[in-house]
Amino acid sequence: MSAFDENTVELAALEYFAELGYCTGYAPVDAAVGSVRDSPSDVTLWDRVTSALSRLNPDASPMMVGEALKRIQRAESQDTVLENQRLHDLMVNGVPVETKAADGQPATVLLRLVDFDRPRNNDWLALNQFTIVENGHNRRPDVLVFLNGLPVGLLELKNPANEHATMRHAWNQIQTYRSQIPSVFVPNVVTVISDGTAAAMSSFTGGFEHYAPWKTIDGRDVITNRPALEVLLKGVFAPERFLDIVRNFVVFSDEPVMDEASGQRRRALIKRVAKYHQYWAVNAAVESTIRASGPDGDRRGGVVWHTQGSGKSFEMVFYAAKLMRDPRMANPTLVFITDRNDLDDQLFGEVFAPARILPETPIQAEGRDELRSLLTRASGGIIFTTIHKFAPGEDGDTNPVLTDRRNVVVVADEAHRSQYGFSETLDSQGRLKAGLAKHMRDALPNATFLGFTGTPIESNDRSTRASSVITLTSMTSRARLKTVRQSRFTTSHALPRSSWLTIPWPLLMT
């Protein structure tokens, strides 16, 4: 056997986990059948699950903990993706358990399965060579990662000394596991493949082309002088970051897919996990929005600039989900703006409506009257509309101030096409006329504005306003990823690229 083989990569991975504060071990000893596991078919370490439920819910009786265990173990579907969604919901939202209130009436309480507020209060474990026997198949994933006893990560590693042991072979092995030992994926959050040189991650439903590297640990610098596997593991599995991914960067979506057997399109539940550029951009955009919407904020959330193929639509979903949950925003209202009905239908119907991550159901405004009604609500709401619904009526009726709340956030898709025209000009009949963006701002005077665009905002024919630009590329391009702050984007012409100032956020090379 080569001195540098698959076992070497496994041990290196365990060392990286140990540096993150995980307990590590050798599964034949530390997850032995007969002592730790009742059966080789057990993929969950139930003693650790029980211990976590008791520790994280000190007021829960042993009976309640037992009921929670039964709820976790009780399958509701034979479909692995549906079961994965069920376990994900239990991890994020808690395990519902029936009990009695102080007055003797039936009540439902949620027992925490994960402590999201104190990451180190959870039980973190990584084991290699974990043998699983299921449906007559005996398989041994290279490394399993456990959170409070649940196998949330799976690593498939190949021998870097073997030129035939490629990333594709590692992905193929995961497909074998999906068909032969599907139970290991029921609680799974992330799968990782590596050939010892390259490393990539995705959800277990991801095709090979959807596995992507994670190129930064802290979101500031791309690391090229350390192993890709180390960067990925320390970037994704650091406890605080991993829990952020679990709660805010995993989306299940009912989408049309091609059935390989029949050749027909059908709808299926797809699981997506954010790629590294989506993760860091969303967190930067959320913090920028919170700053801009605060008492001393300037209401300019910034512009997220993408190139094609970088996952803008789902990034907007992640942004909405995380911002809506942030207590600093006090249950905000989000208004998503497009400049065409077909784009409004597409973003709402194909991306947001099927996405099972949002804390409330998005609504598409059908007309000006409904939009006005939706925007007068006291709090909350994810509203979709075209900018034209802010236009004056045929009788000259303009929008009144619909709400003066500061926790209203307007998100403009392809912002370069709609966020201009802030000044009044004389029309051909000598009447003052303002652009749609001004009418929208008049109706929402204290709203914060965030833009998404795939077009560089530096042309001279638009007055797009923003205070910061977060630029993103596709994962395959060789362009730089960076966040820049513009001095002020308030003149009649967009500022040229030379005026951008770099601020602390990723300066990344893809």
Where are the predicted features?
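ATP-dependent helicase/translocase motor core
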Residues: 2-8, 14-333, 342, 346-358, ...
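Structural recognition of the conserved hydrophobic beta-strand(s) that form the central parallel beta-sheet
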Residues: 191-194, 383-386, 410-411, 448-453
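Interdomain helical connector at the RecA1-RecA2 junction of SF1/SF2 helicase-like NTPases
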Residues: 223-228, 461-510
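Conserved N-terminal glycine/acidic-rich loop preference
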Residues: 296, 408-409, 415-418, 428, ...
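Conserved helicase ATPase motor motifs in RecA-like P-loop NTPase domains
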Residues: 307-308, 416, 437-460
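Conserved SAM-binding loop
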Residues: 336
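Inter-Walker segment of RecA-like/P-loop motor cores
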Residues: 353-395
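Conserved RecA-like ASCE ATPase "motif II neighborhood" in helicase/translocase motors
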Residues: 380-439
